[in-house]
């Protein structure tokens, strides 16, 4: 993991945390996927909170010099994906997160903490 990727993970995690994102989880998938190196998953209580989490994350990532390759979902979505290349961020409603259960799908990845970065 290089310093740029570490900064990306820290920046995204901190922005999600600042907007009171719940159950923020970092999964290292670099040994099992060519899609990305890390997934960051977070839950929000409602669409307003999800939107605020996404907006602040994009703002903080841009301030750090990172631009998203793609954003899937919109202000009315209960699952928004932000693709930053090495880091892909998923912000869900609690219900969508439980339903899609990405933690199970990526269970061969390594769960990490903010302190690892």
What do these predicted ranges mean?
Residues 1-35, 47-80, 94-95, 105-117:
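Polybasic/polar functional segments that serve as interface/processing modules
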Residues 37-39:
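Catalytic metal-binding acidic patch
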Residues 41-43:
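Short hydrophobic/aromatic beta-strand micro-patches
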Residues 82-84:
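Active-site beta-strand termini and strand-to-loop segments that position acidic
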Residues 98-100:
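Switch/connector loops and helix/strand junctions flanking conserved nucleotide-binding motifs
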């Amino acid at each position: 993991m290089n310093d740029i990727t570490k900064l990306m993970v820290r920046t995204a995690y901190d922005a999600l945390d600042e907007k009171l994102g719940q159950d923020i989880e970092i999964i290292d998938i670099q040994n099992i996927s060519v899609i990305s190196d890390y997934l960051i998953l977070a839950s929000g209580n409602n669409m307003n909170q999800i939107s605020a989490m996404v907006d602040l994350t994009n703002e903080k990532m841009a301030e750090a010099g990172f631009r998203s390759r793609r954003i899937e979902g919109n202000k009315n979505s209960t699952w928004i994906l932000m693709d930053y290349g090495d880091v892909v961020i998923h912000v869900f409603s609690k219900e969508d997160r439980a339903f899609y259960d990405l933690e199970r799908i990526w269970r061969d990845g390594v769960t990490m903490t903010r302190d690892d970065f």
